[in-house]
Design a protein with these regions (language model features):
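A contiguous, surface-oriented mixed alpha/beta subdomain in the mid-to-C-terminal portion of proteins
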Residues: 1-49, 53-56, 77-80, 94-101, ...
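Short N-terminal amphipathic alpha-helices
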Residues: 59-60
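A surface-exposed, charged beta-strand/loop segment in the N-terminal or early-internal portion
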Residues: 64-66
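Short, motif-level signal for alpha-helix interfacial/capping segments enriched in acidic residues
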Residues: 82-87
Length: 198
């Protein structure tokens, strides 16, 4: 049976645990940083919770959080396997044997990271996750139901090439620029009038 989950950025959702309890009576939310070398940062990291489609939590996610504070996942696998696999993705290896946090649960990064990959590579990265739903109706699917689950290790198994990293960073810069323009138009509209006229 397919179950739906939300992978939420607790740093971007104020009082996330109180909100989860208020919206869905959720008392157990799985921090991806728990049981890792980053456990002391668990209150700021990603959190996995199960969700019922059409519920108050699902609607709040779609209306308020989906744009930047998390992703919707679906899986047939046991919740413990989904959690284990997602936990294995929290950090990556970069060139020069550098370890870095990986915000794969940011919908902008998820789209850029997975959407253009070959099926075989995407299937491996998604592990037991069958579907990821992103804003704008974007759906990323895993095509091999027998994909193994990765396990967290102190040394990351996932490596991002310099080219992939640059691709993801460029997207973040574009996203920041767009948000800056929107902020200026919203709060300083009168000051900006006439600036685009030669």
């Amino acid at each position: 049976m397919t179950r739906a989950y939300l992978l939420l950025d607790s740093h971007l959702i104020p009082n996330i645990f109180a909100r989860l309890f208020e919206l869905a009576n959720i008392t157990v939310a799985h921090s991806l940083y728990l049981t890792t070398r980053y456990a002391e940062m668990a209150s700021f990291g990603p959190v996995l919770v199960s969700v019922e489609p059409g519920s108050a939590l699902a609607n709040t996610f779609i209306e308020q959080w989906q744009g930047r504070a998390g992703i919707w996942l679906e899986s047939d696998a046991d919740e413990a396997l989904v959690l284990e696999h997602l936990r294995s993705l929290i950090h990556v290896r970069l060139a020069g044997d550098v370890t870095a946090f990986f915000r794969f649960y940011d919908p902008c990064i998820t789209r850029l990271w997975l959407a253009d990959l070959a099926d075989v590579e995407r299937n491996l990265l998604m592990g037991p996750v069958r579907v990821i739903r992103l804003p704008g109706g974007v759906v990323i699917q895993q095509n091999n139901p027998h994909q193994p689950c990765a396990r967290y290790a102190t040394t990351p198994w996932l490596t991002l090439s310099a080219q992939t990293l640059e691709h993801l960073c460029q997207a973040r810069r574009e996203h920041f620029t767009q948000r800056l323009v929107e902020h200026g138009q919203r709060y300083f509209a009168a000051c900006l009038q006439g600036l685009d006229v030669p």
